[in-house]
Amino acid sequence: FPIVGIDVVAGLKNILNGDYEYYRLELSVKHDFDIAPLGYSDIMLSGGKIFNKVPYPLLKLHEGNATYFYDPYAFSCMNFYEFASDLWGAVFWEHHFRGFFLSKIPLMKRLKWREVATVKALWGTLSNKNNGSLLNTDAIFRFPEGMSSVSKPYVEAGVGIENIFRFIRVDAIWRLTHRGDRSGQDVDNFAINFSLHLNF
């Protein structure tokens, strides 16, 4: 069955030294399902909205991953503080082929390596009151150089091998949109990530 998550965060001005009053609502749905004989998929859909004007650290700062360690719910080719939103939606999809292709190659069949594919996508907007990248902004703080909204969807995709020595996974990930260097930030259009977990 799908797993549904609802997060509600409230900031109350003048309560416990709070400087801003705002409300943040986030909804997520996670589901795993088999696609026989091609393996199984894990998918998560998430989205949210921030109400009222807030400084940019309280916006949704989309999770970039500048490390070599794989995070299923972060974007491997996105920089930290690259994109911010006050209304957003995202999808994180992983498909585990369980050796559907590699098991047809004799040496690979003996190694029991398994293929995995990923697609991650994000869309978000900023209302004028929170858009600190505008020249004549009404936002509380100006954005750091290179931070912007993600009104043009951000997409990355990858392929990987898991079950290496029974616990290592290696992913190669490509950034498919927003590929040019941005003001104040260098963009990586390709990343290699590693993770450790047991597959039985």
Model-derived features: positions:
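Exposed, low-structure sequence patches enriched in small/polar residues
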Residues: F1-F200
